[in-house]
Amino acid sequence: MMTSMAVAIGCSADITPEDVKVADYKDGKECAVSLTFDDSMKEHYTIVAPELEKRGFRGTFWMVGAWMPAVAEADTTHFTWAEAREMSDRGHEMSNHTWSHPYMTMLSDEDLLNEIKKNDEAILANIGKPSTTFCFPYNAFNEKVIAAAMEGRVGARLKEFWLGGQNSPKEYLHKQVEDALASGSWIAGMTHGLNYGYDCYSDPTEFTDFLDHLKSLESRIWIGTFRDVAAYTAVAKDVTLTVEPAEKGVTVTPATTLDKVLYETALTMTVNTDGKKIKAEQDGKSLEVTYRDNNAYVTFCPFGGPVTIK
């Protein structure tokens, strides 16, 4: 579990530094799950994205630029750049899985950087958004590869659990979620195809059944894109909160050393109020506040000004 720092400066007796902290995950959820899909497969566009959207989820799709056709008729097994942009416009993360899917640990320094850069440029040109996360082909990486891939990014997938194929029966998938809830962890699921590909399902309804299982636990689990969870957890770990007394409440000033453009994210502040209602403002705007048990959960900008809580 990550921690953030709260510093008191003459606080009132009503709210102490111990009462104020940054939640480990968005909205104070207990853990996080990211659903990721490799290799630009056509049914990511035709099946996976629509099934995620039916449940209010968004996924991360790792694209191999060299495999993506300009028009659908040229390749029926991979989605097009136009379809990728459509998925992005619907809220999914479309990110970098190298240009041609090589073993990155076997490349020269020049070829390594070219595989990353060429796909970054293609993604920006076709999607209109930069790739800020990375997925290693064949899950093969070393320290040099990680360093090259992480330049200008918030995260890379270094560990995953199987979403598809014989490696992921129902009991296995449910166990991954149970363990994440118990440990307060962020986990990332990985698969390629549903109906075709080396790790496809014998019965694709196993995938939608798992989505339904996640939906049933949504009050406890944050199902977020890889980029969103990576940015949130990095900023939550880095930020400090300075708590000072204010009229009828406190002022909480956030400070973080991370780049506000690359790591753009809202955070959730947990305030122990013993069940009392509060109002929160930042930079002249009212902030969203929700309640659960004895806590208030305040959505705030870690790159913004002081938060006043009354």
Put a short name on every predicted segment:
Residues M1-A8:
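Bacterial N-terminal signal peptides
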Residues A148-E151, K159, Q166-L181:
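Surface-exposed substrate-engagement region within the catalytic domains
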Residues C31-V33, E53-G155, K159-G164, A188-Y196:
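Metal-dependent polysaccharide deacetylase catalytic core of the NodB/CE4 family, i.e.
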Residues C11-L35, E43-I47, T76-F79, R220-A236, ...:
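N-terminal pre-catalytic segment of deacetylase/amide-hydrolase enzymes
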Residues D109-N114, K170, P204, T208:
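Non-membrane alpha-helical structural segments and their capping/turn regions in soluble enzymes
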Residues P17-D27, E53, G59, M63, ...:
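C-terminal domain-boundary segment and adjacent tail
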Residues R292-K310:
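C-terminal beta-strand-rich structural cap/linker in extracellular carbohydrate-active enzymes
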